[in-house]
UniProtKB/Swiss-Prot annotation:
Source organism per UniProt: Marinobacter nauticus (strain ATCC 700491 / DSM 11845 / VT8) (Marinobacter aquaeolei)
GO annotation, biological process: RNA repair; tRNA 3'-terminal CCA addition
Reactions accelerated catalytically: a tRNA precursor + 2 CTP + ATP = a tRNA with a 3' CCA end + 3 diphosphate; a tRNA with a 3' CCA end + 2 CTP + ATP = a tRNA with a 3' CCACCA end + 3 diphosphate
Protein name: CCA-adding enzyme
Assigned EC number: 2.7.7.72
Domain of life: Bacteria
Amino acid sequence: MQTYLVGGAVRDKLLGLGVKDRDWVVVGATPEDMIQRGFKQVGADFPVFLHPDTGEEYALARTERKQGRGYHGFSVYSAPDVSLEDDLRRRDLTINAMAETENGDLVDPFNGHADLEQKKLRHVSEAFAEDPLRILRTARFAARLQPLGFSICRETMALMRQMVTSGELGDLVPERVWQEVQRALHEQAPGVFFDVLRELGALQVLIPELTDEQPFRQGLSALQCIHRKQGSTAQHYAALLSGVPEPDAVARAKAMKSPNDCRELTHLVGLFMAQLNGASPETRLTPELAMELLDKADFWRRPDRFGVLLGTLACTLQSEPDHLIQQLELAAHRAQSVTPHPFLQKGIQGKALGEAIRKERVARITEALHLPE
């Protein structure tokens, strides 16, 4: 029974990056051997165990064979006779197919270290083509490592184009696609992820709304702005789709099974963009429009979300965003200062109360924006 550190931990250690998670492969053992040593089995599809002290994952060496289309179209073989090299061969990229012995010696049967030095992302074998999710993973690694000078080698780009042409990208379940997109949004250079997918023709399959040049470039520009501000996942995603018409953007967010906060913010950004982009700075925000937007954003019950929305709009609006954001903030602040109490004291109730509050809010917004009533 031999234990090896594998994958990302070895890669990041060689790159001089901080190692966050450590994964291990065990060769020459059975599930019973692991359980006898106090490990807890957690893997449903293949034998993965948690270390009794560290909680780190230890997987028995395994091979995978393609048997059908889609994520579940693989048969897994795990037994004591599976070698370390067999296990590493099933991995996606050579830089992820290295291992380290318990003595710290590097095991590198597929020249991953050389590719690290040459800053190349290269597939381990033709078996790469068996899993279409690897297209997204490779694009995501490009987004992570491009600032360090890495690029995808030509042979791997060619193989991925063939995979896109085969149509298997359409077999990926939305949850798996979203998982990769969500991770990519927070990589070092998230725009690279979408650039790679577009070059491969994969974006046409996964997010066809971004195929055209204008929404794609606008989305990437807004995405880079949000990324510099270290925005949330919802802000990143809404920024990415900010050049897409609101109904189409929301439909894509739903189809991709993104979380509710992503869908809601995508919807609001689309609404505000449609109302505020294009018109002159003097005419595009009237008190009535400000009230309408505050209502649509549910500002009265969710003021914190409105702040998130404004932070996103600061990156998505095409002209004079700072001035417009300041106006919206001021309008919201002044409108929020109106309370029912003075009207209730005057005996105003029911529908008349709501109308009186709204009228006063519009008046205060008008005053705040220095507009004639």
